Amino acid sequence: MSSAPASGSVRARYLVYFQYVGTDFNGVAAVRGTQRAVGVQNYLEEAAERLNSVEPVRFTISSRTDAGVHALSNAAHLDVQRRSGRPPFPPEVLAEALNTHLRHPAIRVLRAFRVPSDFHARHAATSRTYLYRLATGCHRRDELPVFERNLCWTLPADCLDMVAMQEAAQHLLGTHDFSAFQSAGSPVPSPVRTLRRVSVSPGQASPLVTPEESRKLRFWNLEFESQSFLYRQVRRMTAVLVAVGLGALAPAQVKTILESQDPLGKHQTRVAPAHGLFLKSVLYGNLGAASCTLQGPQFGSHG
């Protein structure tokens, strides 16, 4: 579970789950140097400085999210070596200490666990699930309730053809070369991914939104599960499925796009905005019940 450096103190590795509203951040990854933009990781590592570790604490993030993307539950591992031979922090104490010293109210550490010294938060993940939220019937931005702004993609259409979207989604299931849904020029060893689950279902407004405010709006949830995704793959798949829901594409055309394996095709102009996307969960098969899956009630589905 740990290594014993020459100083006599113990270096302990932890897995931490954390959540954030991504609106104010330049993504989850730390921004180094003199840039004014700041990532979620910058704040986490700043809080970790107060742990007084022998070595600077660095977070290795499981799943990188872009600017404006949110996380109900992301994960990272970190090593902490206390001074003067003190024993490692209990996980719950570590989580509480990080939250105490976090300087941004849109970030919160959820839980922490001790893990083996060779555990890797990114490589060990067995499942990642993303949620994308849509709101239809919103013809102007000022029609969207305050407590839904920057938390969903608004569409002026009154409704989506959910049956057609569900039919189109079936073409994406399974193991495929997803080159057509990755950003052109994104270097990856292989564009092949296995999409284990994709769902399209009615959603609901935040419980902070009054019935009168949401009377003309309809909410929709898209969920995607895989061990890993290509850069912006989820946002591009979402945009294509929305095009099907609006009648701009037929369900069969999604299969054609997928099989084209063309990252420069006309469909590449379709990218869903970042603010509707949430990293919902990151799971680790070897941790069993330790994996932390959270879903706020405002993001649930009916039925």
Swiss-Prot record:
Substrate binds at residue 130. The modification Phosphoserine is found at residue 84. One of its GO terms (cellular component) is intracellular membrane-bounded organelle. Pfam families: PseudoU_synth_1. The active site is at residue 66. Gene3D superfamilies: Pseudouridine synthase I, catalytic domain, C-terminal subdomain, Pseudouridine synthase I, catalytic domain, N-terminal subdomain. InterPro entries: PsdUridine_synth_cat_dom_sf (IPR020103), PsdUridine_synth_TruA (IPR001406), PsdUridine_synth_TruA_a/b_dom (IPR020097), PsdUridine_synth_TruA_C (IPR020095), TruA/RsuA/RluB/E/F_N (IPR020094). GO terms for molecular function: pseudouridine synthase activity; RNA binding; tRNA pseudouridine synthase activity. It catalyses: a uridine in tRNA = a pseudouridine in tRNA. Its EC number is 5.4.99.-. It comes from the Eukaryota. Keywords: Isomerase, Phosphoprotein, tRNA processing. GO terms for biological process: tRNA pseudouridine synthesis. SUPFAM superfamilies: Pseudouridine synthase. Belongs to the tRNA pseudouridine synthase TruA family. This is tRNA pseudouridine synthase-like 1. It comes from Homo sapiens (Human). The lineage of its organism: Eukaryota, Metazoa, Chordata, Craniata, Vertebrata.
